[in-house]
Amino acid sequence: MGIGNPYIENGLSLYTAVASTHVIKTTGNKGFIASVIVGTAGVTAPSLTLQNSAGTIFAVIDTSAVRAVELNLKFTDGINAVNAGTTPAKVTITYV
């Protein structure tokens, strides 16, 4: 993935492909990630992790159901959604 503009506007979604890393950057490389909603109903990707650019894992998410994960962390260089699962997963970013 990673084709096109890597910046994601507030409230928009992207789909992470199987065995891929997608770099998500807030506009202007700053802002707090308020929540990340991962998964779609009936879709599983049990190995989806959210990491910073150094590979530090902030969340491991079971996407067997749609759920919100409150991170409340500041990402100055974006966040990586790493999908090591067997199906795509949807990631929705909301930040303030």
Predicted regions mapped to residue ranges:
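Core-facing hydrophobic residues within beta-strands of well-ordered domains
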Residues: 31-33, 45
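Exposed aromatic-hydrophobic patches
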Residues: 25-26, 67-74
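Short, surface-exposed beta-strand/strand-loop-strand elements in extracellular ectodomains
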Residues: 42-61, 91-94
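Tight coil/turn sites that cap or link beta-strands
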Residues: 19-21, 64, 76-78
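Noncatalytic modules at the cell exterior or secretory-pathway interfaces
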Residues: 34-36, 72-88
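C-terminal interaction-tip segments
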Residues: 1-30, 41, 84-96
